[in-house]
Amino acid sequence: MSGRCARKGLRFILDAAQTAGLIDIDMTKLRLSALCFSGHKSLYGPQGTGGICLGQGFRPEPLAVGGSGSESFSPTHPTVMPDALEAGTQNAHGIAGLLAGVEYIKNLGGKAFSVAAGHAKRFIKEMKGVEGVTLYGDVDAALRTPVVALNVRGRDSGDIAALLWDDYGIAVRAGAHCAPLMHKTLGTEKIGAVRFSFSHFNTDEEVDAAIAAVKELAK
C-alpha cells in the first residue's frame, strides 16, 4: 500500500485507533505520512485523548488556529510544531493520563498483547463448535486484535448483551460499533453484533465464564 501511494504521490495515513498499544507499528518501514491513534483504548489513557504522529516531510495545514498561549502577542498562529496544530487550551490532565498509560504499556512490553491474544484464541476455539453461534471476521488470522464479534441464533445483539450482563455479570459491547457499512456488508445491520474485547487484565476463569455463558445462551 505504501509503495502504491508513493508512486502516485499520495499521502499514506494509517488509522491505528484499534491497534495502538497492541501491535508494534514501524512508521519508517511502512513509509507512513502520519499515524492517527485514540488514547482511551489500548493505550489506557482518558477518554477524549488521541493524537497524530507525523512522518518525515509531512506538514498538514491546521484545521483551527488561535489561542496557542505560546505566542499570545502575535496576531498570527505559531508555525512551529506542535503548536501549529494545537489551537486553544490543551487537555493537560488528559495528556498526563495518556502519558501514564503509554508508560504502563511500554513497561509491559509485549506481555499485554500476548496474554489478551491467548484469551481471544481460546474463546474463538470454543465458539467454533457451538451450534447457533456466528463468528465474524478472519478468526484464524495469525495476527489479529483480541476482539471477537459474534451473534447468537440471529437474536438482537442488544438483547444478548443485556442477558450477559444481567445474568452473568459479563460486560460486552453490542450494536454497530461505529461501523454501519460493515454491518450492512455482513447482513447484520438490523441486529448488530456482540463484541467481546479481551485484555491482559482478564483471568482464565473469566474467559471460561464467557465461554460457558455463550454456550448456555445458544441452547
Regions from the PLM with identified roles:
Residues 1-219:
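Pyridoxal 5′-phosphate
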